[in-house]
A protein has these predicted regions:
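Active-site-adjacent "subsite" loops/lids of carbohydrate-active enzymes
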Residues: 34-54, 123, 128-181, 274
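Catalytic domains of carbohydrate-active enzymes, especially glycoside hydrolases
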Residues: 54-80, 182-185
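Aromatic-lined carbohydrate-binding/catalytic grooves of carbohydrate-active enzymes
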Residues: 66-102
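Aromatic- and acidic-residue-enriched segments that line the glycan-binding/catalytic groove
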Residues: 81-96, 129-155, 191-216, 261-270
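Active-site neighborhood of glycoside hydrolase catalytic domains
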Residues: 170-176, 180-290, 294-309, 316-320
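Substrate-binding cleft of secreted/luminal carbohydrate-active enzymes
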Residues: 276-302, 313-314, 319-394
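Conserved aromatic anchor
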Residues: 411-422
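Beta-strand-rich modules
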Residues: 448-468
Length: 475
């Protein structure tokens, strides 16, 4: 009899319990938005501010509809700025003329529109590229003109000398300025540290930094160059930790650390010896929050095996940082079917030892559904929404469950949320006859309309990715 009473009480409790929302996946799903050469956005220089904003909003809307949750936006292509800067001139990729005010702040606009849609916005900087071509017309306040002693001509490039401590410090200060003034979610750098080798007969053209080596160097030249980049990466990471510890630092190096590593790997470029990028060291030391090796090869590539390279990077991670490879969605075509990208993402999920993630190179191929790749990903890979993962190595407390009030408003409900510090997004889950649906919105929003539902659950997603317990309303 006592057992029957316990069973009855348990069933009654279940009947009275509020519907609990399903746990959401945690996965970084991003796309690079390149502004250099107008690759992704704006589609050409000189568009009106209205046209530029319209293009970016469409790109963000399509990204959300696809299932992405982050954008990596290039804001400093070549010592220029896609934001209001006291250090560097306006980028010519906006107006066609370096230094000309575009009439709005593209980065501020991008942050607002991304967060409004539940997208993280990572600001992507090229730390040392000063000009893509030495013949380009530059403004009088460009670093090439204001500090020519920091600049080296290398082939067609103009380059900030990584061997000059003042030049390194300048690039760090440019990035810290953005961290301090803008509500970005991450600072991102790609594979350009020392420049890619410029051909010179049968040998690469030497980088012209012997004067810097004589002033600042010690030991062997190649080791000194690597130490310059190591010091830059470590200093930047530590400075951002002190300034805004919740802002991620991510780097997307060349996908092969060294030729022959792992065994059997072939590479036409030695990033360790020619770009002086010891990306394995940065990962091992924990000087990044995520590493995004550019694994642009196919799964069945013999000399550059995608799963073999991914497994190697995952295994070089004693600090348990995020390993989120970049994938070459732009190569979908006759030789690479769209299914390759879905299969690569599946491999990333299976081989990851932490939270999985990836970024598409580049946004244009996804947004414009190159050879049907977007439709395929929506149908097979991104059926369920995902939140960006937390950084488990950062000390942060779980946000409090949100406080909200629901009131009728015509055919919808008005949901009012109480402000919370240290929260990036509200995660709203609604249960209807069709199941649970999810939307993610900016935590600055304190009033939103929702459709009537059997249950509504709201959680707070903290700045470091920690999710609160949900506050639940049920009919």
């Amino acid at each position: 009899m006592a057992r029957l009473l316990l069973v009855y009480l348990a069933i009654s409790a279940l009947a009275l319990a509020k519907p609990y929302p399903p746990e959401l996946s945690r996965e970084f799903r991003a796309a690079w938005v390149a502004t250099v050469y107008n690759i992704d956005w704006p589609t050409k220089a000189g568009l009106t501010p209205e046209a530029q904003r319209e293009e970016l909003v469409k790109l963000f809307d399509t990204s959300v509809q696809t299932g992405l949750n982050a954008i990596i936006l290039q804001v400093r292509p070549a010592a220029d700025a896609l934001y209001q800067s006291a250090y560097e001139p306006w980028s010519p990729y906006l107006t066609g003329e370096m230094g000309r005010d575009p009439g709005y702040d593209p980065l501020e606009f991008a942050i607002q529109e991304a967060h409004r849609r539940g997208l993280e916005l990572h600001a992507w900087f090229n730390p040392f590229r000063a000009q893509t071509n030495h013949k380009n017309k530059v403004s009088s306040n460009h670093i090439v003109n204001t500090r020519p002693d920091w600049i080296k001509r290398y082939g067609n490039y103009l380059w900030l000398d990584p061997g000059n401590p003042e030049a390194r410090r300048y690039s760090i200060q440019v990035m810290l300025d953005v961290v301090e003034r803008y509500d970005i979610d991450g600072v991102h750098m790609d594979d350009y540290f020392y420049p890619y080798p410029f051909p010179n007969n049968d040998k690469p053209l030497p980088f012209p930094d012997m004067d810097s080596f004589e002033r600042f160097g010690r030991g062997k030249l190649n080791n000194w160059r690597r130490s310059n980049i190591d010091n830059f990466v470590e200093d930047l990471y530590q400075e951002i930790r002190k300034t805004k510890p919740w802002v991620d630092v991510g780097i997307s190096p060349f996908g092969i650390w060294k030729p022959g590593v792992p065994k059997g790997t072939e590479a036409s470029l030695d990033a360790y010896s020619l770009l002086y990028a010891d990306a394995r060291k940065w990962l091992r030391k924990g000087w990044v929050d995520y590493i995004m090796p550019q694994l642009y090869w196919s799964i069945d590539s013999k000399g550059q095996s995608f799963p073999k390279l991914l497994n190697w990077w995952v295994g070089e991670n004693p600090k348990n940082r995020h390993v989120w490879p970049g994938i070459a969605t732009d190569r979908v075509g006759d030789q690479r079917h769209a299914a390759e990208m879905a299969n690569q993402i599946s491999l990333i999920r299976n081989l990851s030892r932490g939270y999985p993630g990836h970024s598409h190179w580049s946004a244009d191929s996804v947004v414009n559904d190159q050879r049907g790749v977007r439709k395929l990903l929506v149908r097979t890979t991104y059926q369920s929404p995902a939140l960006t993962p937390p950084n488990r190595w950062q000390k942060a407390k779980k946000p409090e469950a949100p406080t909200f009030v629901l009131t009728p408003s015509g055919e919808t409900l008005s949901l009012r949320l109480a402000h919370q510090d240290d929260v990036r997004f509200w995660v709203i889950q609604s249960k209807t006859d069709e199941g649970w649906s999810t939307s993610v919105i900016d935590s600055k929003v304190q009033k939103v309309s929702v459709k009537p539902a059997e249950a509504i659950a709201v959680s707070a997603l903290g700045l470091t990715g920690i999710l609160s317990k949900p506050a639940i309303y049920s009919e």
